[in-house]
Every structure is written in structure tokens, then in C-alpha cells.
Amino acid sequence: MKPNLRELSQLAGTDIADEAEQEAAALRLVEDGACEALVVSLGASGALLATAAGIERFTAPSVSVRSRTGAGDSMVAAITVSLARGNSLRDSVLFGIAAGSAATMTPGTELCRLSDTDRLFERVRLKSIVTA
């Protein structure tokens, strides 16, 4: 599942004010069996991955934003392709963040470019890990 922050708040049935509440809401959805892995897109702040093992936070590379249209779709598609290629969930999320960031660099409804995604992939960072 890949909600954005607003969608996570709706799924959790509560307002989410800070990182601790983001993590608690995401873990609760995993623990309640809604999904095995939850990737929450946080826009320019990156993303978080929640699994039964805990939370991993990732930073997104800084880019010049031309349009946000399609960023979430690009992120989901890149995660899916990466997993289908046999990459780890963590590496797939990193690739997804790169693709979502790359999509914001394109005008209008144009989706991400692979060359931009590959270049940005090297700039996505694992920020923190919190074990459950």
C-alpha cells in the first residue's frame, strides 16, 4: 500500500501532526493486517516504509519542481518494477523515491524519465531505522 500523508491520516482515522504520529499510524496499519508493507510518500521530505520489523525513513533528493502530477504513480510503478526484478524492498523504495522525484522535474502530466530516475537514485538516502 502506498498512501500519501493525507491518505494515511484517513486510513488511520486520526490527524497526524508529526513524525512520531506518522510512524505510529503506519505501524498500526501493518500490525492490524491491512498490509505487510506500507510506503508513505511524504513529498519533498521523502518517504517512510513500515513493516513488521519497524520503520525506515528515506530522504528525497532536492530537485526543481515543475509539476507534481504523476509523482505518486511514478513512485508506485518504479517500486513494482524494482520488486519484479528481484530487488529488495528497501532498494525498491529508494528507486521509487527517485522516480517520484524525477516525475516532479517534468512538465504537466509527463511521467519520470529513466535517465533522471537512475541519476537521482544515487542521491536518495536512508535517514533512520526504528525497530518495532
Please provide the spans of the model-predicted regions.
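Conserved phosphate-binding/catalytic region of the ribokinase-like
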Residues: E19-A132
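Conserved beta-alpha-beta core of the PfkB/ribokinase-like small-molecule kinase fold
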Residues: M1-A24, G46
